[in-house]
Amino acid sequence: MDKIRNTTAIEYSMDSVAKDLDKNSITVQGWVYSENGEPVLIDVLDENGKSLEYKKRPMPRPDLVRYHLVKAENKNCGFQVKFDGNPEKTYYLLFSTDKEQRKVEIEENNYTALGLFKSYLTHMNAQSIHNAMNYLKQNGVKRFVERVKQGPNLVGYEYQNWFLRQRVKPEELARQSKEQFAYNPKLSIVVATFNTKEEYLKEMIDTVVNQSYSNWELCIADGSTTDAVEKYVKAHYGAYGDKIKFKKLDQNYGISGNTNKALEMADGDYLAVYDHDDVLELDCFYEVVKALQEYRYDTLYTDEDKLNDKYKVFTEPNFKPDYSEDLLRSQNYITHIFFVNRHIYDEVGGYRSEYDGSQDYDYIFRCIEKANAVYHIPRVLYHWRMHPQSTAMDPESKLYCYTAGQRAIESHYKRIGLKDVKVELMPKPYYGFYHTTYSTEPNPLVSILIPNYNLKDTLKTCVDSLYNVNTYKNFEIVIVENNSTDKDIFEYYDMLQKEHDNVKVVTYQGEFNYSKINNFGMKYTKGDYVLLLNNDTEVIEPTAIAEMLGCCLRKEVGAVGAKLLYEDDTVQHAGVVVGFGGYAGHVFTDIDKDDPGILMRPRINCNYSAVTAACMMVKKSVFNEVNGFDEQFEVACNDVDLCLKFREKGYLIVYNAFALWHHYESKSRGYEDTPEKRGSF
């Protein structure tokens, strides 16, 4: 209670401490701020109180703002501090304002009482409360109190509990082992080991040899500086004979070179690269082969999560979408585990050392470019071990990985013939994410189609932004007038057409029907690319139209949506998911515009089933190919239906996170999700 009554204004949380034993460096992540609004300085001290040199960068914490735990001006209260030091010794962070100081020992999950309380609030929900009660019943009060002190960020028990509940059971593994498939491909699992810890080596190999599907081989190429790995494998797994192939390399050829040596040993029908310290689920191979009974996919991938090595629990799941071309160009979301048909490997070759750090990213691109199909197995079957030396714990320590990823994307574009494409790394702290800007050449005419009823000031805001903010100038505006009654709107129409030779106003006489109005207006557009636009929108990002056009020019794309914000700069639209919110709903609504959301999805380009027609660019040829909007959808569902028709024809729907607009739709109205509208859908 003394700690809770502490009158200090400095609140902090030390969320993670990563100690790199090889480089003698320590990285601390957390957050700190003063309740008085004063700036907080950070210093690093050794056990004798001597100040040490360190690198610090601020990290946004929109989650704390979202839960009203800190004020918006404290959004950047997060920090990462990195310094050289002996991981076996004790160090401190010194937090200082003009009025006070707090000296805090560097240890994981070190909180103030209020900091602990606030961290719990950000994780509070019905499931977490249920999990807490179960933990109390199973472990007693004493262990429960100790667990509470460790904080909610310890390992993410909510996911851990879910995963263990749905994990394949021993009886199911036994059944799988007896199942006879019509097609029984040999799976080659290739591993490059390098001074691998015995504990990790055993877990890695055991999760291969205990698979429920038995037609596999494990190919290990060892570039270690000692013969410890070789001795262990031969002593403990010699009985597996040719199923486990081992080669001691005459030198360390680097990650790509060592992996290629392992790939050269493989003679299976499908190949997959497996990291030497990671873990597989025991039904992984079974699920892959089961999928291949339906179709001989050239490439397949699974979901994955992280294995917290300190606490031996699973955390941070990556529930991946089915193959998303734009998402893959924004981040290597596929990663583990990725199976490739041998004929694809024979054609594209193995890893390339010039992409070390993102060698798998480059390899995935080259394989998919040649593949007949990419299949996603929606099960977590791979666990990426997270320990102090891993990239997962301290991304900044391996910045070269991300510049290599940038070059991998650029090489991909060159191979497929996309010219004048610009690839940029996302700014700190979003390492490993990329922004592609596609060329707009030959800069075609874009027709901007705006239905309108009265609301002169609203329409003027929209149109003014098209002329004064937007930088793509080859456009025309077609306004579809529908039953307006205000005199000033007609005066505004006249003024627009006199001042601008690229504005046309046409009149639709019928009652309001969004689909009919847009189908009618489409006939008056001259451009091959049409931006369907609500009158209550406004350009924020000057390159928004160019961003959308660059994507829409790609032959495989049918429609491109934008990132739309409410007036208070929270998200109104960042993609539409069918089945969400009753029938089809906007994702990431109400989060801050800079919030990374889940796996950065609202901040990067990716593919969705649909995007909103409040701001949607379409190829006119594709729009006509599907006969435009279905006019039975008078108000709602028309945009989702249109996008699904595009998808049926094989065209992609792209969400462009960098095409930023305001959409002044009333937040109280929300998306079109009334029972009547769901029934219409």
List each language-model region with its residue ranges.
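N-proximal low-complexity "stem/linker" segments adjacent to membrane-targeting elements
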Residues: 141-207, 414, 418-468
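Glycine-rich, basic loop-to-helix element that forms the pyrophosphate-binding segment
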Residues: 249-266, 508-525
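Conserved donor NDP-sugar-binding/catalytic core segment of glycosyltransferases
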Residues: 279, 283-314, 537-582
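Basic, ligand-binding patches in group-transfer machinery
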Residues: 1-135, 139, 180
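A conserved acidic beta->alpha catalytic loop
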Residues: 214, 222-232, 251, 481-492
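A recurrent flexible, glycine/aromatic-enriched loop bordering the glycosyltransferase active site
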Residues: 256, 313-343, 515-516, 579-621
